[in-house]
Amino acid sequence: MTINHDPTVLPDDLPAPQDDGATRHLTGARLPNIALAATDGSSVNLSRRTGRTVVYIYPRTGRPGQALPTGWDGIPGARGCTPQSCGFRDHFADLKRLGVKQLYGLSTQTTAYQREAAERLHLPFAILSDEQLAFTRALNLPTFSVDGMTLIRRMAWVIDEGVITHVFYPVFPPDKSAEEVVNWLSA
């Protein structure tokens, strides 16, 4: 089924997600020793990254002309993965200037699906796949299910030497996520 929607544009009436406390355990957590497939063909183990890393986590990117999952726009925090990714693309140089050594996106979609989005959106960084949910389960990340898919709720992390030092959750609106991270790093 195809529909006419532009994944880069957010509807005006999106419901805002509420802070349900589902990420409180993450600040100070050491990342698990799990390698994730990346869209650049590499395998990335976030627990072994040195320096400062930023990871933004999102449910799933849509594709122009493809139907959204059932009730997608009514799920608080679901819509906006493409604008969030574009925001991090547009703030990539700012993040580097502020000392971020690595930037990644992360979702449960396949690497092939993510690669198409990374190329279409001209992302200057890799997207990581947790398709098997091993990373998600190891960290007890908040998820939701729709149309048979288990998806991670939207958030962003600042990581220093494999330890999560700051969590942005909930993230809303998603197109301001990168700006929020830049502002926090600038403070």
Predicted segments with their positions:
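Chalcogenol-based redox active-site neighborhoods
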Residues: 1-187
